[in-house]
Amino acid sequence: MSENSNHHCIIVGIAGASASGKSLIASTIYNELRAKVGDHQIGVITEDSYYKDQSHLTMEERVKTNYDHPNALDHRLLSEHLEQLMRGEAVNIPTYSYTEHTRTSDVEVMTPKKVIILEGILLLTDPRLRNLMHASVFMDTPLDICLLRRAKRDVEERGRSMESVFEQYQKTVRPMFMQFIDPSKQHADIIVPRGGKNRIAIDVLKAHISRLLKA
C-alpha cells in the first residue's frame, strides 16, 4: 500500500464502477471507525460533489454531458481541497444536483479530519489524487450487477426514467468504464470482489487505517 508522508490526515480512496458498492463500503468503514477516532475526526467525500458547474449551459446541453468521462469532474479543485484538509484547513465542498445537472449554491463545510474516505468512479485515473492517498481500493463488481443497482437507484432516488438509464449505460457508462475506470484498477492497493459487503476487505482496510493512525 502507498505510504504518504503527511499523516496529519489519512486519505483512503475507494474507486470502481457506478453502483459497485463504493458508498456501502465507505459508510461501513466510516461507521465502524467513528468510535475509534471520534465522530468529528472522520469524514466521507464523494467525487460526485466535484462535477463541474454547468449553470452556464441550457438543460438540453447539460443532459448531453458525458458524466463518466474524467473531463466532467473538477479533480483540480478536489485535490486542492484534500491538500487544504491535510494542512489543517477547512474547505467548502460543492453540492451537485442530479436533477438540475449542475452545482447548487449550497456548500458543505468540512473541517480537518484524522481520516477522510474518498469515494468515486474515476479517482484512480488522476495521479494528483492517487499521490494524496495513503491507501486505494477498487471495487471489482461485475458490470451486470452494477447496471441493475444503478437502474434501481437512479429511478428511485434521482428521478430518472428506466429508458434514459439504459440509454446512458449503452452510450457512455459501459464505454467509459472500459476506457478509463477498469484500467485504473492497476493503481489500487486492494481489489475487492463481491461488492461492499466483503467483510475481509473491510477489516483489512480498518486495520491499515489504524496502523497509519499510530504512525
UniProtKB/Swiss-Prot annotation:
Q: What is its main location?
A: cytoplasm
* Listed pathway(s): Pyrimidine metabolism; CTP biosynthesis via salvage pathway; CTP from cytidine: step 1/3; Pyrimidine metabolism; UMP biosynthesis via salvage pathway; UMP from uridine: step 1/1
Q: What is its EC number?
A: 2.7.1.48
> A GO BP term, please?
CTP salvage
Q: Report the SUPFAM superfamilies cross-referenced here.
A: P-loop containing nucleoside triphosphate hydrolases
Tell me the Pfam families matching this sequence: PRK (PF00485)
Question: What does the UniProt keyword field contain?
Answer: ATP-binding, Cytoplasm, Kinase, Nucleotide-binding, Transferase
**Which GO molecular function annotation, any one, does this entry have?**
ATP binding
Binding-site residues for ATP, renumbered to this chain: 16-23
The record's annotation in Gene3D superfamilies points to:
P-loop containing nucleotide triphosphate hydrolases
GO CC annotation, single: cytoplasm
Matching CDD domains: UMPK
Top-rank EC class of the record's enzyme: transferase
Reaction(s) catalysed (UniProt annotation):
uridine + ATP = UMP + ADP + H(+); cytidine + ATP = CMP + ADP + H(+)
On whether Cytoplasm is a keyword of this UniProt record, the answer is: yes
Q: Where is the protein localized?
A: Cytoplasm
The family note in this entry says: Belongs to the uridine kinase family.
Q: What is this protein called?
A: Uridine kinase
**What species does this protein belong to?**
Aliivibrio salmonicida (strain LFI1238)
